[in-house]
Amino acid sequence: MVRYRMRSPSESPHQGPGQDHESEEQGQGQELNPERVEDYGRTHRGHHRHRRCSRKRLHRIHKRRRSCRRRRRHSCCHRRRHRRGCRRSRRRRRCRCRKCRRQCH
């Protein structure tokens, strides 16, 4: 049975036990090392690590999308192919959100 040696916290994953002299030279710069910055928000091949959104952010996103992207429930006579039934409202009302109003003018 082979026993694996535990790595000390000062050792980086790519260093062996005899290569500690490089980490001493870097000192405090280890946190700001460009190679380590890459690992902060990303994983393999540039895919971004999933992070849970805060409630504040979720609320903001939900509020922003709500105006014109919300799917409206149509009654049974509002079908795309065969428009039979009530023809009361022929004019379609425009969305009044800021984004849509800006596109109209």
Swiss-Prot record:
Q: How is it modified after translation?
A: Proteolytic processing into mature chains is required for histone eviction during spermatogenesis. Transition proteins (TNP1 and TNP2) are required for processing.
Q: Which GO terms describe its biological process?
A: chromosome condensation; nucleus organization; spermatid development; spermatogenesis
Superkingdom of origin organism? Eukaryota
User: Which keywords annotate this record?
Assistant: Chromosome, Developmental protein, Differentiation, DNA condensation, DNA-binding, Nucleosome core, Nucleus, Phosphoprotein, Spermatogenesis
Q: Where is the composition biased (Basic and acidic residues)?
A: 33-42
Establish whether keyword Phosphoprotein is in the entry.
Answer: yes
GO cellular-component terms in the record?
nucleosome; nucleus
Entry's localization field: Nucleus; Chromosome
Biased-composition ranges for Basic residues? 43-74
Main localization, broad class: nucleus
What InterPro entries does this protein map onto?
A: PRM2
Q: Which tissues is this protein detected in according to the database? A: Testis.
- Subunit details: Interacts with TDRP.
> What does the UniProt record say this protein does?
Protamines substitute for histones in the chromatin of sperm during the haploid phase of spermatogenesis. They compact sperm DNA into a highly condensed, stable and inactive complex.
Protein name (record): Protamine-2
Taxonomic classification: Eukaryota, Metazoa, Chordata, Craniata, Vertebrata
What is this protein's gene name? Prm2
